[in-house]
Each structure stands twice: as structure tokens, then as C-alpha cells.
Amino acid sequence: MIAVIGLLLGFLVSALFLIQGKRRRTNDNQEKKRSSSEPVEDVVRPKSYSKSEVAVHNKRNDCWIIIKDKVYDITSYVEEHPGGDAILDHAGDDSTDGFFGPQHATRVFDMIEDFYIGELH
């Protein structure tokens, strides 16, 4: 008799947890649907820079470059650059050709995104 009551009690507790979990998932799904249908107010758009704005950032301690019409602030990377001061050859200017040169490992294509600050207009 005690075993039957124990099994029944275990079944009821399990059922309660299952019902609560389903209810929580349903609420989460409803919240996702609501939030995806609401207009997004805080869309972050990339900043836009002119070539002349980028051009003033042409020093070791203030170094921006352009790669395929995207602007990158690489100031914090200049001292780490394995190619030394070659990175400064196009500081404040378009560095697309140099960036895609044979001297760069493919990992630079992932790394560069960490320095992205906007688009060229």
C-alpha cells in the first residue's frame, strides 16, 4: 500500500513539473512572437565616414584604414602587426589591395571585423 502511494505521489509530482515546463515554454514562445512582430526602434546602423574624415586618422596612435568601402580603426593593432610598420603605409587611406595580399594568413579576414567602425560614403 505504501509503495502504491509512493508511486502515485511520484507520478503527481512528475506531472506537475511537466505541466509547469510546458506552461513556461508556451509563455516564452508567445513572448518571442510578440517581440518579433513589434517594430524595432533601436536598430543600430553603421556610422558613415567620408574619405576625408578617414584621411586624418593616419598616424601610429590614430590609425584608420578602408577595406572594400568599410572603415576600420586599427590603432590598437598597429604595434602587434607582424609586418611591422607596413600597416602604416595606407593609414588613413584605402588598404584593400594590401590587406588581400599574399602575405596575410586567412585568419586576418576574421580578425578585421573586431576593428570595424563604419562604412565609407
Curated annotation (Swiss-Prot):
SUPFAM superfamilies: Cytochrome b5-like heme/steroid binding domain. Heme binds at H81, H104. The chain crosses the membrane at residues 1-21. Signal peptide: none annotated. Pfam families: Cyt-b5 (PF00173). The keyword Electron transport does not apply. InterPro entries: Cyt_B5-like_heme/steroid-bd (IPR001199), Cyt_B5-like_heme/steroid_sf (IPR036400), Cyt_B5_heme-BS (IPR018506), Cytochrome_b5 (IPR050668). It is a single-pass membrane protein. The keyword Ion transport does not apply. It comes from the Eukaryota. GO terms for cellular component: membrane. Its main location: membrane. Residues 24-49 are annotated as: Disordered. It is found in: Membrane. Keywords: Heme, Iron, Membrane, Metal-binding, Transmembrane, Transmembrane helix. GO terms for molecular function: heme binding; metal ion binding. SMART domains: Cyt-b5 (SM01117). Residues 46-121 form the Cytochrome b5 heme-binding domain. Belongs to the cytochrome b5 family. This is Cytochrome B5-like protein. The lineage of its organism: Eukaryota, Viridiplantae, Streptophyta, Embryophyta, Tracheophyta.
